[in-house]
Amino acid sequence: RTYIDTEGIKGVSIEPGFGNSLLFDDEAYEPLYQLLEEQEMILMATFSGSITPVLDPSLPGRFQKIAKNHPGMKAVAGHGGGPWVREMVCAAFFAENIYLAPDLYSVNCPGWQDWRDAAAGLARDKILFGSSYPLCSVSRAVENVKEWGLFPEDERKIFRENGAGLLGLK
């Protein structure tokens, strides 16, 4: 709480299941989620089947549950929630506070076409740009999004507007 007040921190990043046995909806995270909601802050959760020994920690319902239980907290699924792309797109569409950052999984990974479709359609306001540098360079991440073949206004949302809105910079 001290750093929120003195440093203007906008959010916190967690990695459930990576080096620990916690799941998104583990009660141990509840005080953090409550604080983030009270302060209207951002939760950036690394969300990917590739970082955990089993897929259970990354099930979309767990992430959706905490977002719905804390509507004042903005919840970003880092790596976009893969491999559960379609499920996460639906979760973001139905929950005002869920955002998706597909970053290095934006092309040539299972479900990447769903990112493209979501960015051009029902989740166009929920897709955030990211690279996961150094795993994927910023220039490569930009090229990946451009490969989606979106209209310029949809690219603008991904590259700037959606992130600016999330951070309260609009």
Predicted region positions:
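Mid-to-C-terminal alpha-helical segments outside catalytic/metal-binding sites
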Residues: 123-126, 137-170
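Acidic (Asp/Glu)-rich catalytic clusters
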Residues: 1-8, 29-39, 65-70, 89-96, ...
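Conserved, mostly hydrophobic/aromatic
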Residues: 3, 12, 36, 79, ...
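Histidine/acidic-residue-rich catalytic or RNA/ligand-binding cores of hydrolases
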Residues: 54-63, 85-95, 110-119, 135-147
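Structural preference for beta-strand elements that scaffold enzyme active sites
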Residues: 9-13, 42-44, 74-76, 97-101, ...
